[in-house]
């Protein structure tokens, strides 16, 4: 979620201004969708940011979604107007799969990119061989990094800033799964804030987060727990500063690739991957959509399906000039490519 001014007040716990509950009946309208990149065999896992008056989109280029010998690289592209895009940088590390670029702006005004070095040729079901890293740039073109961060084996997903401090969930995958909440002042050094943010065995992983006007943290958390349908439902979390004590509630859907944003009138929008019959493994049953999050009832209400299908999702969300701008990837036209959508949100 990207920084937005003029957020409406949220009342603890999970109570919104009265007008927010009406959003379940309001459909968001996709005004325009444009393919903005397809140079690699597989282009995926996006994020979007406005930095120094330009648009920046970051994503992975690889042979496929993942796999042995697929050493992904991170492409950063930029645009003045959101229509014409050019490459700004290509980040790569020999022998590793660089995955899931996530963008944010540090308190010092630099562009931060979170990623993970996934050693695909030296992996096992016990602990994935991951190293979380960051890159930092003053101009979006020249990048310093990679800088290794967090604990070895923990995939630190993305950084969200509040009052000069960045917060990020890190997760360890495999049979010894675990989660930690980290904090940073500069995007180069991260310290553990909370150990076991979720219980071991919960299979929590990807997250998205925003802070409301009162400084409360709100987190949308994916779970891949196959022990039961309820165990695989996404979670909504909330915490007051200093963000060491969290309250969790089950959402009503299973999701992948979570993104979340609070728009200026206080309403909360999520962009997620959905699964027909909740089947994570069937690419043919998947798509990317936007919908409403109601914290008062811990519910997600679908609104609009983006043009998408198959290997798809992992959106970046930015509110700009009264519209929601969404970067995402999809395979609905054959080749897995990067798309940019502009969406209007009725009042």
Model-derived features: positions:
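Bacterial N-terminal signal peptides
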Residues: 8-17
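Beta-rich carbohydrate-recognition and catalytic domains
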Residues: 23-44, 50-97, 105-257, 261-310, ...
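Sec/Tat signal peptide C-region and signal peptidase I cleavage site
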Residues: 19-21
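C-terminal structured domain segments
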Residues: 310-316
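Bacterial N-terminal signal peptides that target proteins for export
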Residues: 1-9
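Short glycine-centered, acidic/aromatic-flanked micro-motifs in structured strand/loop junctions
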Residues: 101
């Amino acid at each position: 979620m990207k920084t937005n001014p003029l957020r409406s007040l949220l009342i603890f716990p999970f109570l919104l201004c009265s007008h927010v509950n009406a959003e379940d009946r309001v459909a968001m309208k996709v005004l325009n969708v444009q393919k903005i990149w397809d140079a690699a065999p597989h282009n995926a896992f996006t994020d979007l940011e406005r930095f120094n008056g330009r648009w920046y989109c970051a994503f992975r280029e690889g042979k496929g979604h993942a796999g042995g010998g697929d050493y992904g690289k991170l492409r950063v592209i930029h645009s003045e107007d959101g229509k014409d895009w050019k490459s700004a940088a290509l980040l790569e590390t020999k022998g590793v799969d660089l995955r899931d670029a996530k963008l944010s702006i540090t308190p010092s005004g630099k562009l931060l990119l979170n990623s993970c070095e996934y050693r695909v040729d030296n992996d096992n079901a016990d602990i994935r061989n991951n190293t979380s890293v960051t890159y930092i740039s003053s101009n979006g073109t020249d990048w310093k990094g990679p800088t290794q961060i967090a604990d070895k084996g923990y995939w630190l997903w993305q950084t969200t800033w509040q009052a000069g401090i960045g917060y990020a969930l890190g997760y360890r995958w495999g049979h010894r799964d675990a989660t930690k909440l980290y904090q940073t002042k500069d995007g180069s050094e991260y310290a553990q804030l909370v150990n076991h943010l979720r219980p071991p065995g919960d299979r929590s992983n990807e997250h998205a987060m925003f802070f409301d006007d009162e400084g409360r943290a709100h987190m949308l958390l994916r779970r891949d727990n196959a022990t039961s349908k309820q165990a695989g439902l996404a979670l909504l979390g909330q915490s007051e500063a200093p963000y060491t004590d969290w309250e969790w509630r089950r959402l009503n859907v299973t999701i992948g690739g979570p993104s979340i944003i609070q728009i200026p009138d206080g309403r909360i929008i999520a962009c997620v991957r959905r699964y027909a019959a909740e089947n994570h493994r069937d690419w043919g049953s998947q798509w990317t959509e936007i919908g409403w999050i109601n914290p008062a009832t811990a519910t997600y209400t679908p609104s609009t399906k983006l043009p998408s299908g198959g290997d798809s999702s992992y959106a970046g969300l930015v509110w700009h000039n009264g519209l929601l701008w969404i970067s995402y990837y999809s395979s609905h036209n054959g080749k897995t490519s990067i798309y940019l959508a502009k969406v209007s949100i009725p009042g």
